[in-house]
């Protein structure tokens, strides 16, 4: 295929545009898409207020059916939703506190940092928890975040309060997640996969292009339910977990799939 023409030519033949421009740039493109009558999908770097709709497959596919446009939430919000939404659907109520241990930069972003520091996000809560409520407002969630000098993954430390009478055990929570798409559960002690570096080596070992891991990774032996309090860790490959969400968002906007 020979690439030629400009944005006007593209919008003349497109049904939907996935806008992956840098954060806060997409707003300048919105009017162009609307004028051309083209549907649009922005990314998590844009604000929910700009689009009025946000999307993640596990939380609100149906609400996004046939809309003019939406915003796929960030990699972290996507990862939180994948494990929290099944819990909410079972319990009918959920209160969550989480800490996001964020990679400092993507592997190719050599100009970013920190390099030899841990940098807290001093805006509390960080945007990640409130962003979950743009796709599942019934979940009560707050988050804090720190950036650490690594490039390969984020890690979430999650404490979820379940309601009385939830009927779950540590084992049944793990079983629930094992039935969900886009979640990988492994026992770190048994497999030796106890760090994010080893998780990404696993992605390469199973033949994923670019070493991508579209699923989120939950350590089985890091899951513990004590009474009504659930503790767990999960790892997020920030470069790839939203890719299938964008594909699902296209299907929702075009009305071709009623369920993700």
Q: What residue ranges belong to the model's regions?
A:
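C-terminal substrate-binding/catalytic lobe of Rossmann-fold NAD(P)-dependent oxidoreductases
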Residues: 1-4, 94-95, 99-233
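Glycine-/small-residue-rich active-site loops that bind phosphorylated ligands and cofactors
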Residues: 18, 165, 238
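Glycine-rich loops and low-complexity Gly/Arg-rich segments
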Residues: 42-44, 64-68, 121-125, 167, ...
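Generic surface-pattern signal
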Residues: 16, 137, 178-182, 251, ...
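N-terminal Rossmann-like NAD(P) cofactor-binding subdomain of oxidoreductases
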Residues: 1-109, 255-257
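Generic C-terminus detector
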Residues: 228-260
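Conserved active-site and cofactor/substrate-binding residues in soluble primary-metabolism enzymes
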Residues: 5, 12, 75-82, 123-131, ...
